A protein has these predicted regions:
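Hydrophobic alpha-helical transmembrane segments
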Residues: 1-5, 89-97, 102-104, 183-206
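Cytosolic-facing loops and C-terminal tails of multi-pass membrane proteins
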Residues: 218-266
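Post-HEXXH active-site segment of zinc metalloproteases
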Residues: 150-174, 178
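Short helix/loop segments within enzyme catalytic domains
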Residues: 81, 172-228
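Short amphipathic alpha-helical coupling elements at transmembrane boundaries
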Residues: 137-140, 144, 187-191, 205, ...
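Active-site scaffold of zinc-dependent metalloenzymes
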Residues: 106-132
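Active-site recognition of the HExxH zinc-binding catalytic motif
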Residues: 122, 133-154, 158, 185-186
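Hydrophobic or amphipathic, alpha-helical segments that drive membrane association/targeting
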Residues: 1-102, 240-243, 258-266
Length: 266
């Protein structure tokens, strides 16, 4: 089974459990509203209510936070944009139909931000650290995320992780999905460049640089799975195997869902 198929199955699995638990919560609340004299175990009812409150409070917090931070950082990046370089870069990659913003900052910054209209943000430090070919490899990696709407997909995955983090299947699924997405973005950049040399130089230099400052509400070039990404560079002819380790979390999550179904109908 290819990594792309595995990634899609894992994502579908996350969404399935999220929707299933939400449906059970809805049924339970409907049952509660129709019958105030529930015959079930009182402590289970209280616990179920607490789980519902916790879940939806976390989801709402994430939605508000994402909306606020996304707007905040877009305004911040626009206010610090290097007008001339931004204009040149947008003209150079005009066929991408994607807005690029070059921020005046000596530090390394390369990310994709925005869900409805994703944008690529890079710092002037990127142009100081890397040559033209290496910069293009970085931009191609970010463009992959833009053209595949990965910000929306990762936001949904993060929403599931925040709201349904108590399901054992969610956290490893999000981690696996994010890792494969980064590998696919790297592979796309390599294919477009025709060589792994330029992207490899970027990754190795970033490893030497150490920790990179990150921003919320964005997909970052350096954020995930650097060891797997370097392995893909070193062995481009081989498919990088990312362990899933989802069998036990899947069984535990199924047990939790079954418990909710039994308790909700009692």
């Amino acid at each position: 089974m290819s990594s792309v198929v595995k990634m899609r199955l894992v994502y579908a699995l996350m969404v399935f459990f999220g929707l299933s638990v939400t449906m059970q919560m809805g049924l339970f609340l409907t049952h509660q509203l129709r019958d105030f004299n529930l015959q079930g175990i009182v402590i289970f009812t209280i616990l179920f209510d607490l789980v519902i409150v916790y879940t939806f409070a976390r989801i709402m917090r994430r939605i508000v936070s994402q909306w606020y931070l996304s707007r905040k950082w877009v305004r911040h990046f626009r206010s610090r944009a290097h007008k001339r370089v931004t204009k040149q870069l947008n003209y150079k990659y005009r066929k991408w139909n994607t807005e690029l913003i070059v921020v005046e900052d000596d530090a390394f910054l390369a990310l994709t931000i925005g869900m409805l209209r994703p944008k690529i943000v890079v710092s002037t430090g990127v142009f100081d650290l890397f040559n033209d070919h290496e910069v293009k490899a970085i931009l191609l990696h970010e463009w992959y995320h833009c053209r595949n709407r990965d910000n929306i997909k990762m936001f949904i995955a993060t929403l599931l992780a925040d709201g349904f983090g108590y399901l054992p299947i969610i956290e490893p699924s999000v981690r696996f999905y994010h890792t494969i997405k980064e590998l696919l973005a790297d592979r796309f950049a390599i294919q477009q460049m025709g060589t792994e040399l330029h992207l490899g130089n970027v990754l190795l230099r970033l490893v030497k640089m150490g920790k990179i400052q990150r921003r919320e509400a964005a997909i970052h070039f350096t954020e995930t799975a650097m060891d797997y990404r370097i392995k893909q560079i070193l062995e481009p002819e081989k498919a990088v195997k990312v362990p899933m380790a989802l069998f036990r979390p899947f069984l535990l999550s199924c047990s939790f869902l079954l418990l909710m179904m039994i308790g909700g109908s009692s």
